[in-house]
Design a protein with these regions (language model features):
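Flexible, glycine/threonine- and acidic-rich loop/arm segments that mediate assembly and lattice contacts
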Residues: 1-239, 244-263, 269-323
Length: 323
């Protein structure tokens, strides 16, 4: 052990007759760090049926063709048919995070009494940090299959929609608004499924391009719609009604807009058909482990679940905008 003698000048801002000025700090820590994504807070939460979580999707009903349905009323000969159902599964994934509190540092902080709230704040932020990772992975998780998982991450909504084949690319000279409206019209016009898109998610940069296009080309300012208490966003009039344009920072883009090679995606989705299947609790759970040899408090945050985009091949669409 080594003892040191320190000069008070090293700790004081000013030392003089009748005054010793020392460092003092505001009691609140300035913090506007980005935490949750929008999509993760709006996705439908349902309990998992097991591991994997399973459900059935009906892809067709017993609907005979006109040639088979209409017969001679004096010679009725029906054609046997049956509905079509497919079994689907959602593998559950695990997210985990840990934060440790050193006993000595906790007791020093408690005795100083200036930042006594930090232990609770850091634990809350650890939960929020895990949810941030969860929110990003809901879109961008790098797994490639629901039936045969290949990675520990989610099979993200983007990957599921792309695997469904519903993707269109708008060139640099194409109208963004017209392209999105055309996609929505095609979805609603489906004769096989009752598709009702409810929202359009995109990076704020793309939404700004849409806003400017409407103002420049049509001298129109987009109307607004309230999507939750106190939160209002722009809305685009489509054949499915006024769809909210929801800014989502977790949706990235490539290149520099205006260069002609930047690709900015947006997603027309039916939100009620996107589900998060959770195990035990939809929220992360915090476990405090026993003290280690160093007397550190170990706090482990855990979350189990998986995301599924139902009807990925017909109820949702990816629109890639090149600018």
């Amino acid at each position: 052990m080594k003892a040191l003698f320190l000069d008070l000048h090293a700790a004081a801002d000013f030392l003089g007759p009748g005054a010793v000025e020392i460092n003092r700090y505001q009691t609140e820590i300035f913090d506007i760090v980005r935490r949750r994504g929008v999509f993760g807070q709006r996705v439908k939460q349902v309990p998992a049926t097991g591991h994997p979580s399973r459900f059935f999707e009906q892809t067709a009903i017993n609907s005979p063709t006109a040639a088979n349905a209409f017969v001679d009323p004096r010679n009725i000969v029906p054609v046997v048919g049956s509905p079509t159902r497919v079994e689907r599964s959602v593998p559950l994934k695990a997210l985990v995070s840990e934060i440790n509190y050193n006993l000595f540092d906790i007791e020093v902080g408690a005795q100083q009494s200036q930042f006594a709230f930090l232990q609770a704040k850091d634990l809350t932020d650890s939960v929020e940090g895990l949810l941030r990772t969860h929110d990003v992975a809901l879109w961008n998780g790098n797994d490639t299959s629901l039936s045969t998982p290949t990675t520990a991450q989610y099979f993200g909504a983007i990957g599921q929609i792309e695997a469904g084949g519903n993707t269109v690319t708008l060139g640099t000279s194409d109208s963004i608004v017209d392209g999105i409206k055309s996609v929505v019209a095609q979805m609603v016009a489906s004769s096989s499924y009752e598709v009702r898109p409810t929202a359009i998610y995109a990076n704020p940069v793309l939404l700004d391009l849409i806003d400017r296009e409407m103002k420049t080309e049509f001298n129109v300012v987009l109307s607004t719609v309230q999507i939750t208490g106190g939160l209002t966003v722009k809305a685009l009039s489509t054949q499915a009604g006024d769809l909210p344009l929801i800014p989502e920072w977790a949706l990235g883009y490539t290149g520099t807009p205006g260069s002609g090679s930047a690709v900015l995606p947006c997603y027309v989705v039916s939100e009620d058909l996107i589900e998060y299947h959770w195990l035990t609790d939809p929220n992360p759970r915090v476990f405090q482990l026993g003290l280690t040899g160093s007397l550190a408090h170990q706090m482990v945050v855990v979350k189990f679940g998986g995301v599924v985009v139902k009807g990925a091949s017909y109820a949702h669409y990816e629109v890639k905008v090149t600018r």
